[in-house]
Amino acid sequence: MSDSEDPSDEVQYHVAVGPDDIADAVLLPGNPERVDKITALWDGYDERAEHREYRTATGTYEDTPISVTSTGIGSPSTAIAVEELARVGAETFVRVGSCGAIQPEMDVGDLVITAGAV
């Protein structure tokens, strides 16, 4: 197992959170401003960290613990967030936000579930 796969009880450099800061499930918007929109729907929450494009809050939704961490734009910054959050205990990640599509059968507002990426 490489160092990047080892569980850690230390605060992670980029996302600036440790194991006590996040829930098992984490929503991942790109824009840090979307953290406010997401947490407004929750029962309650606490801001846990903000560093560069990464902003994290943890709370509950219908009595279920949940976290949100913004990732910034693009796959590299998202990969950093997922790897560091996994190191401190997050197990489930759901990317939320907007995207574009070149398929003519897709309309604005369609739910898109990615099955793979290149």
Residue ranges and their predicted role:
Residues 2-118:
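Metabolite-binding pocket within alpha/beta catalytic cores that recognizes anionic/polar moieties
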